[in-house]
Curated annotation (Swiss-Prot):
Main enzyme class: hydrolase
HAMAP family registered for this protein in UniProt: Urease_gamma
Keywords tagged on the record: Cytoplasm, Hydrolase
Full protein name: Urease subunit gamma
Pathway connected to this protein: Nitrogen metabolism; urea degradation; CO(2) and NH(3) from urea (urease route): step 1/1
Catalytic activity: urea + 2 H2O + H(+) = hydrogencarbonate + 2 NH4(+)
Compartments it resides in: Cytoplasm
Gene that specifies this protein: ureA
Subunit structure: Heterotrimer of UreA (gamma), UreB (beta) and UreC (alpha) subunits. Three heterotrimers associate to form the active enzyme.
InterPro entries registered for this protein in UniProt: Urease_gamma, Urease_gamma/gamma-beta_su, Urease_gamma_sf, Urease_subunit
Record's GO cellular component terms: cytoplasm
Gene Ontology MF annotations: nickel cation binding; urease activity
Length: 100
């Protein structure tokens, strides 16, 4: 299987988010990379499902809460930016303060 670099990055996000969700299901609090992976994955999938940029920007701050992550992680992530593929092209989605 030959994947372009962009597709390799997306696959890495999927694997990282899956691992993070498994750890979360075991009751573990998420660290910085795990939180980023889950938020990124959900935004990419939301775009694929046809949600708008505005919807994703709003929804992105509800994916994880402070209770889901280790202490200090919310302050380490002031925003998340994801280049997502929408039905009408690729757009940048920015979520400010994604963990509240």
């Amino acid at each position: 299987m030959h994947l372009q670099p962009k597709d390799q990055e997306k696959l890495l996000v999927v694997v990282a988010a899956d691992l993070a969700r498994r750890r979360q299901a075991r009751g573990l609090k998420l660290n910085h990379p795990e939180a980023i992976a889950i938020i990124t994955y959900e935004l990419l999938e939301g775009a694929r499902d046809g949600r708008t940029v505005a919807e994703l920007m709003s929804w992105g701050s509800t994916i994880l809460s402070r209770e889901d992550v280790m202490e200090g992680v919310p302050e380490m992530i002031p925003d998340v930016q994801v280049e997502a593929t929408f039905p009408d092209g690729t757009k940048l989605v920015t979520v400010h303060d994604p963990i509240r």
